[in-house]
A protein has these predicted regions:
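Soluble extracytoplasmic regions of secretory-pathway and membrane proteins
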Residues: 1-455
Length: 455
């Protein structure tokens, strides 16, 4: 199973491929490609997937009016999903799920494919009006839909329509004939914004990810408790070479600028893509900060045991937390006082070559593999380390994501007297191979360019 899940696709490249092959219309957009794992036909598979959201800004200018923006173009539809390690004979993704309505080539249930809440849903809409919503393109015509979910706030009364007319600065709820007693308004539809409205005291991970659980599309956000007052703990902002970690990472930058020296994987915020239902599942029951919030808001949090087994199977170790822990461990793996004082064994996060041959810090990545002495393959988040100002690999850390092992960090160190090539050295060896370098030179001609993949 480890070899069957070696990743051939990079999410940046796959995102543009999804957009080209599966957006199907100009007003559909894939915001991001997420990586998850599913048991499909008895096999544990690593899968890349993305939600097909509706981007109203891409609607043709002649069709952009109040009715279309607020009443008709209300939701995206379905997703694209493909295995990390397969391509077709044309070199394209071998889709597990594709098209509209969704067509699945594996045993995966999609009972509700509509996306009213997502990462691209940045404006408010009305449902339950007298006009049918655009559902998806169907041949020369369009399929329509009437929202029947529990999401949204009822505005059936004149008083409520008046309040929201004032709130949104539009008289349409009062002057339009489209509204009925069943009408609803949906706002705070962006999942990050929605979660922040409910739990502003949790620091949310920068990468909400999509999961298909119990036949429905779910957005999962990792929620942290943070503090700048933990005794004898070094703030993230004072760690060695922290600027390399923070580059292009606004969430981590905000965390560092606030003086954070305490962070815990406190909760998972789960938002249903169809009705916007938000559940907050507690992860770390021993976190004193979370425990305090639970006492203040006793009805806000849900015990982890209440989540369905299928939903829990998609929880993973948080990205930003792993980045912070890896950053701090560069120095704090040293347990000899003198060695630590002199910073003799300081590690760094490795460099890798990216697009346009630019060099940047390697990001953690997800794999399915069997750890030494483990019973079987599991979903891991891993990151290698190199010595400071050197490129050979000295260790790699793994965060376990599955079942009872969730949250365990495992470090594997290599003998200091043995050379183990690091990512940048492997890139150099690739460039030094005459056959490969010749192909790279050929492909980089006549306006074409080679995109270097993630190692």
């Amino acid at each position: 199973a480890t070899l069957d899940n070696i990743r051939l696709w990079d999410y940046q490249t796959l995102l543009s491929t999804y957009q080209e092959l599966q957006s199907l219309r100009s007003y559909y957009r894939f915001h991001d490609v997420d990586i998850d794992r599913y048991t499909l036909e008895g096999d544990y598979r690593q899968v890349m997937l993305a939600a097909r959201e509706l981007d109203y800004d891409a609607v043709d200018g002649k069709a952009r009016n109040w009715v279309n923006q607020r009443l008709k173009y209300t939701h995206g539809y379905g997703l694209a999903a493909s295995p990390v390690n397969q391509v077709t004979v044309e070199g394209l993704p071998d889709f597990f799920v594709k098209n509209i309505p969704p067509e699945a080539s594996v045993d995966i249930a999609i009972d509700q494919p509509r996306i009213y809440y997502g990462e691209e849903t940045n404006h408010y809409i009305y449902t339950g009006t007298s006009t049918a919503e655009f559902d998806y393109p169907s041949g020369s015509d369009n399929a329509t839909n009437l929202y029947d979910g529990t999401g949204g706030v009822s505005i059936g009364s004149l008083l409520r329509r008046s309040i929201y007319a004032f709130e949104f600065g539009s008289l349409k709820p009062l002057t339009s004939n489209y509204f009925t007693s069943a009408s609803k308004v949906h706002y705070y539809r962006n999942v990050l914004q929605r979660a922040r409205q409910v739990v502003p005291f949790l620091h949310l991970d920068s990468d909400p990810y999509l999961a298909l659980a119990d036949g429905r599309l779910k957005w999962i956000l990792d929620g942290y408790t943070i503090s700048d007052r933990y005794p004898y703990s070094e703030p993230l902002a004072l760690s060695q070479n922290v600027d390399a970690l923070l580059a292009g990472q606004p969430q981590l930058t905000q965390m560092a600028e606030s003086g954070t020296n305490y962070i815990r994987d406190a909760a998972k915020v789960v938002i249903d893509a169809y009705d916007g239902t938000l559940n907050i599942y507690t992860i770390d029951e021993n976190d004193p900060v979370l425990t305090t919030y639970q006492k203040i808001f006793p009805d806000l949090f849900t015990p982890l045991e209440s989540a369905s087994e299928q939903l829990k199977s998609h929880f993973r170790y948080p990205l930003n937390l792993f980045q912070v822990q890896s950053q701090m461990y560069r120095a704090y793996h040293m347990d000899d006082i003198e060695v630590f004082y002199n910073q003799e064994d300081l590690w760094q996060l490795p460099q890798q070559i990216g697009q346009n041959d630019t060099s940047g810090q390697m990001q953690p990545y997800y794999v399915i593999m069997r750890l030494p002495n483990a019973d079987g393959e599991e979903f891991l988040q891993i990151l290698p380390f190199t010595p400071a100002r050197k490129d050979n690999m000295v260790a790699w850390m793994a965060a376990r994501c599955d079942g009872a092992q969730y949250g365990q960090l495992v470090l594997y160190q290599f003998p200091k007297q043995v050379l183990v090539y690091g990512p940048k050295q492997i890139e150099a060896r690739i460039d030094q191979n005459p056959e490969i370098s010749g192909q790279l030179t050929l492909w980089n001609q006549q306006g074409s360019s080679v995109i270097r993949g993630n190692l």
